[in-house]
Amino acid sequence: MAEASRNNTGVGSSAPVSAFESFVSKYFVRLLVGIAVGGGALAFFVPWMLYIAGITGEADTNLRLHILYVTGGIIAVLGLVETRHKNTTDRAKALSEQARQFNETIAKEREKIEAEKAKNEQNHIRQVHAERRSRYTTAIEQLSNRENATTRLGGVYALIGLIDEWLADGALLTNKERRKEGQVIINSLCAYIRSPFPLAERAEQLDGEYTKDLQNDFRGDTEKFDADKRAFTRDKAALEEERQIRQNIIKEMREHLLDAEEPGTWSAFDYNFSNTYFFYPIDFSDSHFSASLDFTQATFTEKADFFMAAFAGEADFSKAAFIQDADFYGVKFTKRADFCKASFGGEANFFDGAFLQGADFSEVKFTGDANFSRANFTEGTEFFKATFTGDGTFYKAKFNGPILFSRALFMRNAAFPKAKFGKEANFFMTIFTKEADFSGSKFSGHASFFEVKFSSSVNFFKTKFAKNTRFSGAQFNGPTNFSITIFHSKPEFANTPNKSYKAKFSHKAAPADYSFKTAAKSPYKIETREQEHNGVKFIIPEDAMLFDPDNPFAWAEL
């Protein structure tokens, strides 16, 4: 406390001196002249006044001298003060200059240190990147080693590790640069997946047991038999090794693409699997693809699993061949999904799928059952010339955009119960070989069944048609049910106004199998008439006609 008091006192006491020195320095000449003149005046006038007052002698002389002494003393003190102030100022300037030079030196040293640090960091970055690229080159060489599967697998994991390193390098690279470096490696892995493997063509044979017979195939030549069996065993092992390597690549990709709700660390990469021959199962379930995905002309020899996958970028499966089952349950396509001219040899499951910009299934071949139940098509969707060899199920499917099924072929049952067609639904010249079920469906836009062929039964029970509905030129070969159907526009069974392209109803169906009793609340009814064939009376739509389905040239009304 005492020291603090002393410090405070010192600071306080120095302030007046500093102010006094500044004052003296500022007005030094004036003070000097003023004091000299004043002192001289006093030395002259005071003795003179004393003389007038009658005080004379040595007193006035002594007084004059004392005044001059005091004046000289004051002038001397002022000179000392000025000298001290000048010295202090010069010293302060010198210290300020020293401080300035010191700060400049420090700043230059700091800049030098920062520059050296930046240079070292750049060198470090270059070294790190050079080391990674060196490891990349080594890994590619390992991946190219056809003699040793273990070496190839090591190359795979080295590349995978490098991708993660690049992506984690936030301190050295921008996000765009990290993605660019990772994409290079992804391209290499995809290229490896796409590369042909000759033994894959014999996968079906090599996956089984050795079946050749010594006597029948080699005429008892034991040496040839043993050599062929050894070659089979060697090829079988090589195929399995390569299968494991490629499956591991897909497995690692999937683990970095999880999950479907949020993008994974590898989701932003483009994946090119075009023309790939997958001789092993593919599992991309729950994967999230944010960028483009290309499976054009790819062949899936075993199950392809895309369960609950999300495709935020372009997804192209055009001309892909799925030999076994393909599971797209719950998938989400943010952009238009392209399956044009693809083929599905097993079951194709798109149950609960979401197609936010529609889909193209033109000329697709579904050999197994195709399930699109509860699927949601937000934009226009095409099944033009699609072939359904198995059942085609669209239970509660939602087509919010235009839907095109023209010239499609359903070889087995076609089920559209409770489906919703938000805009135009076009089934022009579609062929339904077995049952066609539209019961409970709702057509909010125009519905065209122009020249459709219903070879078996067709069910429109409780179906709602909000706009124009055309059945002109359609063929009904089996039971036809329009019971409790609602039409908000008059249904057309022939072209107007000339009544050409009449709908045709087979005379081989039982009359009771034809039901045109629409709902009581339907604004429009199906106007009917009675027509007789060989003594059998049929009730058919007014503008329709009976025909013989066994006579392809029987276009005229019977």
Task: Annotate each language-model stretch with its function.
Residues I125, T137-E141, E147-L153, Y157-I160, ...:
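N-terminal leader/targeting and pre-domain segments
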Residues S5-G38:
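Juxtamembrane interface helix immediately N-terminal to a transmembrane segment
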Residues E3-S5, S13-A15, E21-S22, G54-G57, ...:
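Eukaryotic N-terminal accessory cofactor-binding modules
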Residues F20-V24, G72, Q531:
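Extended hydrophobic/Leu-rich segments
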Residues F23, G57, V77-G79, N103, ...:
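Helix-centric, low-specificity signal for extended rod-like, repetitive segments
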